[in-house]
């Protein structure tokens, strides 16, 4: 198997686990943690897509940066830039008290935010899964 296809599959699999972790945290009332894992799931799914295009993108963890790269291959990813911006906000604010003036992430990030972040990440994973099928050789 092509090493880029194999790596794509690994990153997409981990993205799906991260999304499940986000859902589990959200159900348990850990909304800050859920938003962080949603952001991670989206970023890993986009890396999976980029591996399909023989790009090894490890220098960024930004969903928007990864979307910008993905758009160079598939214009359809442009529709997810707004979601990417929202998700990227959680990369730090979901974990570090100094990112939230006067509060801590666990007490400030709401259920509404975690539900939306999970939806956005799930949408990004779904488009990557769809595009991945288009890229896979018939023999797989």
Question: Where on the chain are the PLM-derived regions?
Answer:
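Terminal alpha-helical segments
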Residues: 1-140
